[in-house]
From Swiss-Prot:
GO BP, one annotated term: translation
Full protein name: Large ribosomal subunit protein bL32
Listed Pfam families: Ribosomal_L32p
UniProt-listed InterPro entries: Ribosomal_bL32, Ribosomal_bL32_bact, Ribosomal_zn-bd
Similarity remark: Belongs to the bacterial ribosomal protein bL32 family.
Entry GO MF terms: structural constituent of ribosome
SUPFAM superfamilies referenced in this protein's UniProt entry, alphabetically: Zn-binding ribosomal proteins
Residue ranges of the region described as Disordered: 1-35
Organism: Xanthomonas euvesicatoria pv. vesicatoria (strain 85-10)
GO cellular-component term (any): large ribosomal subunit
HAMAP family: Ribosomal_bL32
Sorted UniProt keywords: Ribonucleoprotein, Ribosomal protein
């Protein structure tokens, strides 16, 4: 088992943990549908930045 050579001070421990904080997910609202989605991801309807990018099952059923 690994054993440390010297004790880690509280400040050194805090410096190591300074990058462990969690951040909230960045959400965007689609301009055409108004749907909330993750940044740089398409919506469930297949829209990205206001344009239809991919045909989805729900849109294929509505077109028929």
């Amino acid at each position: 088992m690994a054993v440390q050579k010297s004790r880690v001070t509280p400040s050194r421990r805090g410096q190591r943990r300074s990058h462990d904080a969690l951040t909230a997910k960045q959400l965007s609202t689609d301009p055409t549908s108004g749907e909330i989605h993750l940044r740089h991801h398409i919506t469930a309807d297949g829209y990205y930045r206001g344009k239809k990018v991919i045909a989805t099952k729900s849109s294929a059923v509505q077109e028929d």
